[in-house]
């Protein structure tokens, strides 16, 4: 265990001691890919798709009455750990909208699912642009992947939260030997879940092979930046509540939009870091481009 820890420390130290030109390359990639513009577009699509996503998730859990408590646990966990402030107000409004959506017909539910799939498709397209991937997946495969994420995502999320809660309950017994150990573990839990989510996003979504060695530093960077952004945003809103004077009763909407925008910037910064340090950049060149390069060489 100590050998592995020292190995990772050496790798991180070597990574940080690299020439400044690497960081300039990273910054230039972020500028060239216009991550602030893409984050704004994804924030708009997310705000449009948020209620449909929740409505579809509620519909999936409604099909399994035994998972009602799990659905409530997921809602509580997400709003507590991933929304920096005003979570009660936001949760009340979104749950109300999703509840009204559940009263729609099958055609209406299908329309909501299409809007939710729109978000997943745009995330896929944005990450593929970051990895410079021009080759698209076949339409049927893309639809199958998107639908699997939409339908199985809430189930896997509920299962992971249930397993995590069980592990934390077991670890709480360690407080007898190490006071406050379970509380310390609970503080690390959002970091761990965020990091796992970022690793899955950076390795599974791009239409190329992304190694875990490249995804782990990017996911760790994104998870830490996400928590810092969440704390900073909550601190700003708590101490500078001028937005309530300007927007009044609808202040929750711009707050939610700004937070989603900042969250997407963090996601894209982590993706840029992962793509920049990925050792498979040459191997990951799309097959179409590789064929063109080989034909050019043969001609020369």
Curated annotation (Swiss-Prot):
Membrane topology annotation: Multi-pass membrane protein
Organism superkingdom: Bacteria
Cell inner membrane is among the record's keywords: yes
Alphabetically ordered keywords of this record: Cell inner membrane, Cell membrane, Membrane, Transmembrane, Transmembrane helix
Main location as per UniProt: membrane
Subcellular location: Cell inner membrane
Spans traversing the lipid bilayer: 47-67, 100-120, 143-163, 181-201, 215-235, 249-269
Keyword Transmembrane included in the entry's annotation: yes
A Gene Ontology cellular-component term: plasma membrane
InterPro entries xref list: UPF0761_bac (IPR023679), Virul_fac_BrkB (IPR017039)
NCBIfam families (UniProt xref): PRK01637.1 (NF002457), yihY_not_rbn (TIGR00765)
Family according to the record: Belongs to the UPF0761 family.
Protein name per the record: UPF0761 membrane protein PSHAa0171
Organism encoding this protein: Pseudoalteromonas translucida (strain TAC 125)
């Amino acid at each position: 265990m100590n050998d592995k820890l020292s190995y990772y420390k050496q790798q991180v130290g070597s990574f940080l001691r690299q020439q400044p030109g690497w960081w300039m390359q990273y910054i230039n990639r972020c500028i060239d890919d216009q991550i602030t513009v893409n984050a704004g577009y994804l924030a708009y699509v997310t705000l449009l798709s948020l209620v449909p996503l929740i409505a579809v998730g509620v519909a999936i859990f409604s099909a399994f009455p035994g998972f009602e408590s799990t659905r409530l646990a997921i809602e509580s966990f997400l709003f507590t750990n991933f929304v920096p402030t005003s979570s009660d107000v936001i949760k009340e409004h979104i749950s109300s909208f999703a509840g009204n959506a559940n009263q729609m017909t099958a055609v209406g539910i299908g329309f909501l699912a299409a809007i939710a799939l729109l978000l997943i498709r745009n995330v896929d397209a944005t990450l593929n642009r970051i990895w410079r991937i021009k080759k698209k997946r076949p339409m049927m495969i893309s639809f199958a992947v998107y639908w699997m994420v939409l339908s199985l995502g809430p189930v896997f999320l509920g299962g992971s939260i249930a397993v995590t809660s069980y592990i934390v309950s077991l670890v709480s017994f360690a407080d007898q030997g190490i006071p406050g150990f379970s509380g310390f573990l609970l503080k690390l839990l959002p970091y761990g879940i965020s990091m796992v989510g970022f690793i899955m996003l950076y390795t599974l979504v791009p239409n190329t092979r992304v190694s875990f060695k490249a995804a782990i530093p990017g996911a760790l960077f994104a998870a830490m930046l996400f928590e810092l952004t969440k704390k900073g945003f909550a601190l700003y809103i708590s101490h500078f509540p001028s937005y309530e004077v300007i927007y009044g009763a609808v202040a929750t909407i711009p707050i939610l939009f700004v937070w989603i925008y900042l969250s997407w910037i963090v996601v894209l910064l982590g993706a840029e870091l992962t793509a920049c340090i990925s050792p498979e950049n040459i191997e990951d060149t799309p097959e179409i481009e590789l064929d063109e390069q080989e034909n050019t060489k043969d001609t020369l």
